[in-house]
Amino acid sequence: KIIFLFFFIASFFKVSAKDLATWGITGSKCSQALAFVQRFGSNGKMALSSGIQGFLTGYNSAVMLNNLQGKSREKARVINRSSLDSITNYVTSQCRRTPSVSVYVVLLKYYKTLPYAKY
């Protein structure tokens, strides 16, 4: 079921039309992500949650790696402070307010509010 969902999501978003900074549902405009969730209901919300989790984990890992290698002073954050469901609801709420922004912009703003991790 998860593999099918992955391929379904991948085919939903055009990837050859332009260069992308981030890929998948978190790389889309908020309006597209909201339409996707509305169209596919709980499966759409699960896909959005998975994209959010992947984005935050990947971004945080890059921040941590750059910090540990001395390339940046920015430190990683505690990304599981709230439940994934709460984060998804936050992103959905912010996307409703500003449907023209990209989901990753909402996520980067959210990320900056998180406490620093200790490592």
Predicted segments with their positions:
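Sec-dependent N-terminal signal peptides
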Residues: I2-S11
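Short N-proximal segments of mature Sec-exported proteins
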Residues: L20-S93
